[in-house]
């Protein structure tokens, strides 16, 4: 069963995502800030990370940069989620994230993108 790490400081938003993405048949782990996200990613090695940009303690851009330098997480698909706009999108691509979704999220499109990325990872693992 694929594992998705959801990183956001809004617990209601995390619950909504878990509910709406339940049909994907994935296990979810959560982190409420950047430091927790790094710890969870290193220990549990999720198959995909949904990462908010505005987080307490360590922002999502910094988390992504650190994860991309770690051998165990450098190829893990990362999807940024944020209410921030296009300038952030450009920086996201430069940081090697796999995608960027503006809040409020288009959940159908997000589900499709998650499925694509997990399928890609499965094929690359073979």
Description of each model-found segment:
Residues 115-126:
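The C-terminal output helix
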Residues 14, 56, 86:
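The feature encodes the CheY-like receiver
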Residues 15-23:
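Charged docking surfaces used in two-component/phosphorelay signaling
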Residues 8, 52, 82:
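Active-site residues of response regulator receiver
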Residues 18, 62, 84-102, 112:
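Alpha4 helix (beta4-alpha4-beta5 surface) of REC/receiver domains from two-component response regulators
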Residues 25-32, 40:
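Short hydrophobic/Thr-rich beta-strand motif most characteristic of the beta2 strand and flanking loop
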Residues 44-50, 55:
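Active-site beta3 strand of CheY-like receiver
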Residues 33-36, 59-62:
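Acidic catalytic/metal-coordinating carboxylates
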